[in-house]
């Protein structure tokens, strides 16, 4: 997704052959924490070696005409001198109510909300894309249209690899990127101390 010859809708990089639909096992919900976990079997693999770093939407279409999205971020290996756009996966997980409770509410409301979240389930928001289309996509299109040297990582990358933004000129957080781990926060603070600019577009 991004800006391609004044087309903000994106460009198709990959298409699979028709895939069989697999009957998956029933998802599990932890009765104590409310964690929803879909331990499903994969029936497809997407080759990423030839993909440019960036954010991709995978569109899944059925023979009946139904469709949904899945997110894919190809992380930039070298962000030196680049403006890094951070994709907020943890906030998507917090608001996701697919198959069970989110961090905000369950069947009864706030009292039986999930205390533990899993990314191993589809996303109920944005036709499967989470909050990306509303809060991140316009930012990506604007940055790429302006010719800014962009790079891409997720918030999980910041939490798990402090060097993922080493040498970046700036880090951009799109709207509503509100769920952080302590490790992510430390990574950003340390980068800021070393001179990396931090920019927040409505993230609280």
What is the role of each PLM region?
Residues 83-86, 165-204:
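Short alpha-beta junction capping motif
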Residues 17-20, 25, 38-52, 60:
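Short, hydrophobic beta-strand segments
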Residues 41-45, 57-59, 65-75, 183-187:
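Short alpha-helical segments and helix-capping/turn motifs at coil-helix boundaries
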Residues 1-25, 30-34, 55, 63-165:
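Aromatic-Pro/Gly-enriched surface loop or interdomain linker
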Residues 44-47, 122-132, 169-182:
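The substrate-binding groove and active-site-proximal loops of carbohydrate-active enzymes
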């Amino acid at each position: 997704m991004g800006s391609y010859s004044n087309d903000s809708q994106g460009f198709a990089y990959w298409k699979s052959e028709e895939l069989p639909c697999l009957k998956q096992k029933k998802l599990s919900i932890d009765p104590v924490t409310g964690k929803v976990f879909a331990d499903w079997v994969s029936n497809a693999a997407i080759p990423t070696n030839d993909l440019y770093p960036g954010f991709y939407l995978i569109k899944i279409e059925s023979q009946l005409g139904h469709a949904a999205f899945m997110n894919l971020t190809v992380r930039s290996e070298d962000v030196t001198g680049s403006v890094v756009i951070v994709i907020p996966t943890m906030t998507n997980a917090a608001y996701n109510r697919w198959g069970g409770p989110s961090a905000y509410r369950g069947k009864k409301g706030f009292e039986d909300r999930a205390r533990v979240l899993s990314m191993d389930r589809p996303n109920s928001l944005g036709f499967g894309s989470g909050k990306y289309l509303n809060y991140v996509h316009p930012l990506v299109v604007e940055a790429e249209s302006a010719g800014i040297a962009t790079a891409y990582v997720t918030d999980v990358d910041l939490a798990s690899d402090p060097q993922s933004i080493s040498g970046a000129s700036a880090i951009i957080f799109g709207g509503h990127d509100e769920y952080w781990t302590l490790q992510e926060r430390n990574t950003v603070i340390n980068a800021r101390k070393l001179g990396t600019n931090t920019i927040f577009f409505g993230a609280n």
